[in-house]
Amino acid sequence: MPHQQMLMLFGLLPVATNISTWWNFGSMLLTCSALQVLTGFFLAVHYTANIDLAFSSVVHIMRDVPYGWMMQNLHAMGASMFFICIYIHIARGLYYGSYLNKETWLSGTTLLIMLMATAFFGYVLPWGQMSFWAATVITNLLTAIPYLGTTMTTWLWGGFAINDPTLTRFFALHFILPFGIISFSSLHVMLLHEEGSSNPLGTNSDIDKIPFHPYHTYKDLFMLSVMITLLLTMISFYPDIFNDPDNFSKANPLVTPQHIKPEWYFLFAYGILRSIPNKLGGALALAMSIMILLTMPFTHTSKLRSMMFRPFMQLMFWTFAATFLVITWTATKPVEPPFTMISQVAALIYFLFFISNPIMGWMENKIMKV
């Protein structure tokens, strides 16, 4: 039977013996994706995409729908878990040179952009105070595009300001984009298995492989159990830990929050945007903070794939990781000294990591005389 052959192939799928826990985040992302689609469907059943009713419908889900509080918290906290997993997944790709599998890396970066768009549209849907103002600030960046900007913004809003048509189309986009993410995820996995996974040493894995099942199946299941336990603990004891207090009040276009900020997983990009005192420059830096990942396969000059044996690049990588956290922190602070200076320095170091990658590679090759 074809399905039996498929299962047999999956069981016999050869995988490198030495891949570590950092390789488990792909399966964790797949689980997060399934969870988001499932909980999202049940929320969409009870949600009303209307500016007068959206906020009330979310309150209704939380209070009146059986297990609605669980669905809503799982969906909101699941998004945070999704981004934690994807950022670790990307960091692992950067550290161990997985980006040299070009097609997989480029499809993965496209997936990240689609995921960020989906999460942004989802953040607007509850029509809370922070949802409304974050949407206003971010969509307004389109006006920085010369000639086309104003037209594109009006088209996206469905009018001359954020209103009912905006919420309707954001809901439609939030509903449809996950299906694109699922399609791209399938493509991502297919492209990965054309060449196979890399390993921590960055060497050819063909000399030492074991079947995927049962070894890696149980390893994946263990990490999934840890993730789901953490997720359920968070929604049970700290359901509002990532929520903004302003979002518990209905959107009011006449009252601006003291400090407008998006969800925590966008703060690094938002921090880079705010660090540049120019609208177009900030918008370009925001786009480049994600798009620069696309350059990695083309700027790798070192003869070694993994950073495991590259001490200079290890130092650069961990500086980059610390910078990511610093920018996230500064983005939560008001636009005033010393936070503006810290975010500008951190943004510069963030981009320096990608610029220094080929230079470090050349230096290492010279030192090793290869």
UniProtKB/Swiss-Prot annotation:
One of its GO terms (molecular function) is metal ion binding. It is found in: Mitochondrion inner membrane. Signal peptide: none annotated. GO terms for cellular component: mitochondrial inner membrane; respiratory chain complex III. One of its GO terms (biological process) is mitochondrial electron transport, ubiquinol to cytochrome c. Binds 2 heme b groups non-covalently. A ubiquinone binds at H193. Gene3D superfamilies: Cytochrome Bc1 Complex, Chain C. Heme b b562 binds at H75, H174. This is Cytochrome b.
